[in-house]
Amino acid sequence: MIVGRVKEVWRYPLKSMAGERLEGSPVGARGLYGDRGWALRDEEAGEIRGAKISPALMLCAARYRAEPAAEGAPPHADITLPGGAQTSTDDPRVNDLLSDLLGRRVTLWPLRPASDRAHYRRAMPAARLVGFLSRSRNFRRLALGAMRLAGKDKELREDFGREPGEPLPDLSALPAEIFEFTSPPGTYFDAFPVHLLTTASLDALARRAPDAAWDARRFRPNFLVETSGGVEGLVESGWGGRTLRVGGLRLRCEMPAPRCSMTIQAQRGLPKDPRVLRTIVKEAGQNFGLYASVESAGRVSAGDEVELL
């Protein structure tokens, strides 16, 4: 079934900064070549972090100087700071500039090999033990439930931007390694290598909250799919377990994407708008968009058909 066409292709050279809109890109097991090739380490917390360091990170933008390869170190990227000042990943001042902007000590890192597990490990005590136990989905579900009952879910509520009385998302379907590491080792994406969003979903929530600032850029998808006539509503939320053919690529639809506080923050060209997340929590079951993994590599370009198999 043809569900639409690729309207936009996006790559994000530096985790949590504004990305690059592309005409097309090769996609491998780790997603679009060069996607999230760089990230910041919060030296005070002792781990890799995204916009939870400071929402100001989302007011920055990054652009590669050269096209990335499938493997190996990412190319250097130019960075535009709020107000228009320029720096880059190879600027000797970049760590100081970003630390001053964010109000805490940070350092910039390219992707490290997956074997460098210490680089990706969470700073929390007993991260290795938690990672081992989290191989069981039942443990993940019970542990999150116990945190809620014990009132120890404050950090989760802050990260996910939940107000009192709002539910927390069910994170038990996320990869087990996310409970030990800040991202799957060898990557800087949150959970899965590809994130997809449809115009049908955007339109559906815009109808429910027409005064909110709905814009695909706010949700940082790799692919924005313009859905065909007759395809309406939160369609991708029902695609879990199915396969998508996107251009020359085949994707396995893994799970709906749980949304966090990043969606309400001001970004380049977009205002801060808490109504966005309030609507997602109330009207979309806390999820918006789709996480996917790569079944077979290929190239995707704007205009390519998207087929649900």
Locations of the language-model features?
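Metal-cofactor-dependent catalytic cores
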Residues: M1-L309
